[in-house]
Amino acid sequence: MPLHRREAAPAKLNLTLHVTGRRVDGYHLLDSLVVFLDLGDVVTIAPGPLSLSLTGPFAPGLAAEPDNLCLRAARLAGREARITLEKNLPVASGIGGGSADAAAVLRALDASPRRPEALGADVPVCLASRPVRMRGVGEILAPLPALPELNVLLVNPGRGLSTPAVFKALARHDNPPMPEPLPDFPDAQALIGFLHECRNDLEAPAIALMPGIADCLAALRSAGAQLARMSGSGATCFGLFASAAEAQAARARIAGTNPGWWVAASGLAPAKH
């Protein structure tokens, strides 16, 4: 193991999330276009007995307990390390925070467990941390060609949302998947046009549980987003804008009128090779 290592845990964004079925064990089948952003949490490891320290603006929402995903990841890898998690993303927010953190621990430890999905359905895709089409229960990953640059604005209403509760509120579990194969996306407008034909099937049940999500979506649309959608099981929403300057202007506008919300502009994470 490296003596000291710092590993980014980039935010995950579900540009689409189609729920296409449910297995007999209760796990849902998904078809999702997933990308990663150039903002997120940061994991640092150092030699020592297994421990976890929490820093960052959202650290108060977590506890360094044995069931924390960072500690579980280290145990799954069979490694000891002093782990520090800089928590920059809201907790339970639909952008992969905990799963991305666990994946970052595994990468930092140079560990390749046989079943990373044992830590959570989003851990395999977060281990990849590159644009993919994700299917199955999250374990079937098809890498995508480089996508056009996107100007993203994230908005969270300041509250977490339980993933199991959102799935439980889902009215239909056998929705249509995305087309096969996916089209080419020569530019951002082609990708955004395709996204308008797709869905997040968890958006409606999440809004029923937390109406504030609809307010986030309305704020993004009012600020000029070309597409506004919820990510994952919520409550974070995202808007896609024509330029980085427009995304930053929308960030200032939305943050200025909604001081309790978390608002952050981002682009896509650099491609991994």
From Swiss-Prot:
Name recorded for this polypeptide: 4-diphosphocytidyl-2-C-methyl-D-erythritol kinase
Any GO BP: isopentenyl diphosphate biosynthetic process, methylerythritol 4-phosphate pathway
Binding residue positions for ATP: P90, V91, A92, S93, G94, I95, G96, G97, G98, S99, A100
Leading EC class: transferase
Function (record text): Catalyzes the phosphorylation of the position 2 hydroxy group of 4-diphosphocytidyl-2C-methyl-D-erythritol.
EC numbers: 2.7.1.148
Residues at the active site: K12, D122
This protein's encoding gene: ispE
Keyword annotations from UniProtKB, A to Z: ATP-binding, Isoprene biosynthesis, Kinase, Nucleotide-binding, Transferase
InterPro entries: GHMP_kinase_C_dom (IPR013750), GHMP_kinase_C_sf (IPR036554), GHMP_kinase_N_dom (IPR006204), IspE (IPR004424), Ribosomal_Su5_D2-typ_SF (IPR020568), Ribsml_uS5_D2-typ_fold_subgr (IPR014721)
Recorded superkingdom: Bacteria
Pathway: Isoprenoid biosynthesis; isopentenyl diphosphate biosynthesis via DXP pathway; isopentenyl diphosphate from 1-deoxy-D-xylulose 5-phosphate: step 3/6
Family: Belongs to the GHMP kinase family. IspE subfamily.
Catalytic activity: 4-CDP-2-C-methyl-D-erythritol + ATP = 4-CDP-2-C-methyl-D-erythritol 2-phosphate + ADP + H(+)
Alphabetized PANTHER family for the sequence: 4-DIPHOSPHOCYTIDYL-2-C-METHYL-D-ERYTHRITOL KINASE, CHLOROPLASTIC (PTHR43527:SF2)
Keyword ATP-binding: yes
Matching Pfam families: GHMP_kinases_C, GHMP_kinases_N
GO molecular function annotations of the record: 4-(cytidine 5'-diphospho)-2-C-methyl-D-erythritol kinase activity; ATP binding
